Amino acid sequence: MKAEALFDLDPGVKVRTRFAPSPTGYLHVGGARTALYSWLYAKHHQGEFVLRIEDTDLERSTPEATAAILEGMAWLNLAWEHGPYFQTKRFDRYNQVIDQMIEQGLAYRCYCSKERLEDLRNTQEQNKQKPRYDRHCLGDHKHSPEQPHVVRFKNPTEGSVVFEDAVRGRIEISNAELDDLIIRRTDGSPTYNFCVVVDDWDMGITHVVRGEDHINNTPRQINILKALGAPIPTYAHVSMILGDDGQKLSKRHGAVSVMQYRDDGYLPEALLNYLVRLGWGHGDQEIFSVEEMIKLFELESVSKSASAFNTEKLLWLNHHYIRELPAEYVAKHLAWHYQDQGIDTSNGPALEDIVKMLAERCKTLKEMAAASRYFFEDFDSFDEAAVKKHFKVAAIEPLEKVKEKLTALDSWDLHSTHQAIEQTAAELELGMGKVGMPLRVAVTGSGQSPSMDVTLVGIGKARTLVRIQKAIDFIKSQNV
């Protein structure tokens, strides 16, 4: 039998990896880390990365889940050279290989009823034997191929499957532990373990990076590959990700979908940096650009131990990237959050200026968008705590005075606005806070913002003056 290449298998490419999610849900952080490791290994070796959608579970696979996976991969910027390929579109190919295997005696039809199989299992369990098929139908000539049947792979009965896992080292499993795997169901559809084998063969996959939950599938898949005369890829099984409580990561630990992190205001660079460190490291280094990851990543450096997810560490990394990446780049991601929060940014400062103003204060872009709403939209109310603290009757005079000085300004910049506040404080013999804090609440609606000169320039002159007058009227109305 021969492989049927889906694309040009360049002989110069020595490493070809794949990410093969099942579209039964969103792209979760465990899957994203597997994709990242697979992608990095291919890039490190100037190889190719293939995306394959394993949608053989027809009942649970959905187009929405496929779209969510593709969206997550695109957001993380994990680009693929080939794909996405869908297993459901390759059933003819799988069945062609199965038919050839039957002809060559590598597989056989099994006509056993559910009742017979249940009786067999019960008998084996009573005799304290490992449940396995007894090859009752091997060499069966009594039944017609038209009768309902499954197809089983004729697994070797002697010897062992031995493979060198790139992460875990030598793994050996006795063939006596393995059953004659069903490779085609009664309805004619090929099974997961078989489709994976044919795909890896046809796609020339050299390295399979996947979760440790697949270790039990590997010896079965290796035996099928050997039967086909196909090359055996190198396997690397990475450990699971745990929550900070030591339990398997799940929804109760917070966001587990990649796109949920986007929605919560994280940058893809932060999530990638965090995920690569969940099981891999290079000395004590914490911050890795994608270029550094590609240069340094090796599967042999991946830990065998499970890693615990720490949201605080991810938040720290996110704040680092908000501060350190170019403001123009961060602003492109920030724009999505304004749109998501229904904030019209057409009338206000440039988004990259918002990033420069708030990068030190805000740890997420979601927080940054919410904290800068007042630059683009007027507000109907003031923060209650800020009103109680700063909107006393004594605030009316400095607000009126600073409004007068700001109104008279010919140029609206950092120097002139700061001077107006400073002069107001000096003339009224007040500390800067007695002028600046009521002014801050007046123009932002809250007691927190960047420095007042930066804030005023961002809001603009016309809006600033209207808001100060609104605050003066509000204080007077509260103290009638």
From Swiss-Prot:
Residues 122-149 are annotated as: Disordered. A motif ('HIGH' region) lies at residues 21-31. This is Glutamate--tRNA ligase. Transmembrane segments: none annotated. ATP binds at K251. HAMAP family: Glu_tRNA_synth_type1. It is found in: Cytoplasm. Residues 122-146 have a biased composition (Basic and acidic residues). CDD domains: GluRS_core. Pfam families: Anticodon_2, tRNA-synt_1c. Monomer. It catalyses: tRNA(Glu) + L-glutamate + ATP = L-glutamyl-tRNA(Glu) + AMP + diphosphate. Keywords: Aminoacyl-tRNA synthetase, ATP-binding, Cytoplasm, Ligase, Nucleotide-binding, Protein biosynthesis. GO terms for cellular component: cytosol. Its EC number is 6.1.1.17. It is an enzyme of class 6 (ligase). One of its GO terms (biological process) is glutamyl-tRNA aminoacylation. Belongs to the class-I aminoacyl-tRNA synthetase family. Glutamate--tRNA ligase type 1 subfamily. GO terms for molecular function: ATP binding; glutamate-tRNA ligase activity; tRNA binding; zinc ion binding. It comes from the Bacteria. Its main location: cytoplasm. Catalyzes the attachment of glutamate to tRNA(Glu) in a two-step reaction: glutamate is first activated by ATP to form Glu-AMP and then transferred to the acceptor end of tRNA(Glu). A motif ('KMSKS' region) lies at residues 248-252. The lineage of its organism: Bacteria, Pseudomonadati, Pseudomonadota, Gammaproteobacteria, Pasteurellales.
